[in-house]
């Protein structure tokens, strides 16, 4: 099943954490979940964010406000001159939701080690009619050179304008999808071409994560309860 499920969802609480962090009752849960999906869709549609190379959007709900943490490889594009763009983004989201919104930016230092950014880069080049084999080879080379231990890229659609759609895959290194302690990042993107859409999936393996290397905000793991020590009965002295 490791080959079928989403690698991030399979590792939640082990070495991955949730992108949305809040608590709600059964009555409000569905509405808040739908609101999170709308927030992420709005961010992708805002002109200031389309070319910002956004890797992840975290949503943290407080009693009085919503904090949106945007992970991007190009923070200057989102912030803008003297913070004009980030204020505009916050105003647009706040107007549509009717709630107080706080936008925070977190820079992604190494874009080659984030699967979402690799998928977006491949999709962008495919939309520009680049040779898909050359694009896949270059993406794998850049990722492995940056320190990854393995990468797998799969694209599907009318590749090169062919009449029949097909799937092509390229892999470098090892990607152990069945190993739960493996740090595997997953990303997906779509390339809009004149022939139709081409889907891009990326699996990126960065190494093993053991107990002491887990992220601080990851879900709490169950700890083994210590067994109470049983005291040995004192031996009676010889009379």
UniProtKB/Swiss-Prot annotation:
It comes from the Bacteria. SMART domains: KH. Keywords: Ribonucleoprotein, Ribosomal protein, RNA-binding, rRNA-binding. CDD domains: KH-II_30S_S3. GO terms for cellular component: cytosolic small ribosomal subunit. InterPro entries: KH_dom, KH_dom-like_a/b, KH_dom_type_2, KH_sf_prok-type, Ribosomal_S3_C_sf, Ribosomal_uS3_bac-typ, Ribosomal_uS3_C, Ribosomal_uS3_CS. It holds the Pfam family Ribosomal_S3_C. GO terms for biological process: translation. One of its GO terms (molecular function) is rRNA binding. Residues 39-109 form the KH type-2 domain. The keyword rRNA-binding applies. Residues 219-239 are annotated as: Disordered. Binds the lower part of the 30S subunit head. Binds mRNA in the 70S ribosome, positioning it for translation. Belongs to the universal ribosomal protein uS3 family. Part of the 30S ribosomal subunit. Forms a tight complex with proteins S10 and S14. NCBIfam families: rpsC_bact (TIGR01009). This is Small ribosomal subunit protein uS3. It comes from Treponema denticola (strain ATCC 35405 / DSM 14222 / CIP 103919 / JCM 8153 / KCTC 15104). The gene is rpsC.
């Amino acid at each position: 099943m490791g080959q079928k499920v989403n690698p991030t969802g399979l590792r939640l609480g082990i070495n991955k954490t949730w992108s949305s962090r809040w608590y709600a009752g059964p009555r409000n849960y569905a509405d808040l979940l739908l609101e999170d999906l709308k927030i992420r869709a709005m961010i992708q549609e805002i002109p200031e964010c389309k070319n910002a190379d956004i890797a992840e959007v975290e949503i943290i709900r407080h009693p009085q406000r919503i904090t949106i943490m945007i992970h991007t490889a190009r923070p200057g594009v989102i912030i803008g001159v003297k913070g004009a763009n980030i204020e505009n983004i916050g105003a647009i989201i706040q107007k549509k939701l009717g709630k107080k919104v706080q936008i925070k930016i977190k820079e992604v230092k190494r874009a080659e080690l984030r699967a979402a950014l690799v998928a977006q880069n491949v999709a962008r080049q495919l939309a520009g009619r680049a040779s898909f084999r050359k694009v896949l080879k270059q993406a794998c080379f850049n990722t492995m050179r940056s320190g990854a231990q393995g990468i797998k890229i799969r694209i599907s659609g009318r590749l090169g304008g062919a009449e029949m759609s097909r799937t092509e895959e390229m892999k470098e290194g090892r990607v152990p999808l069945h190993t739960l302690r493996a740090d595997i990042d997953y990303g997906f993107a779509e390339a809009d071409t004149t022939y139709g859409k081409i889907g891009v999936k990326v699996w990126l393996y960065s190494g093993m994560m053991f107990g002491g290397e887990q992220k601080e905000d990851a879900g709490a793991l169950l700890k083994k309860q210590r067994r109470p020590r049983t005291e040995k009965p004192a031996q009676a002295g010889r009379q």
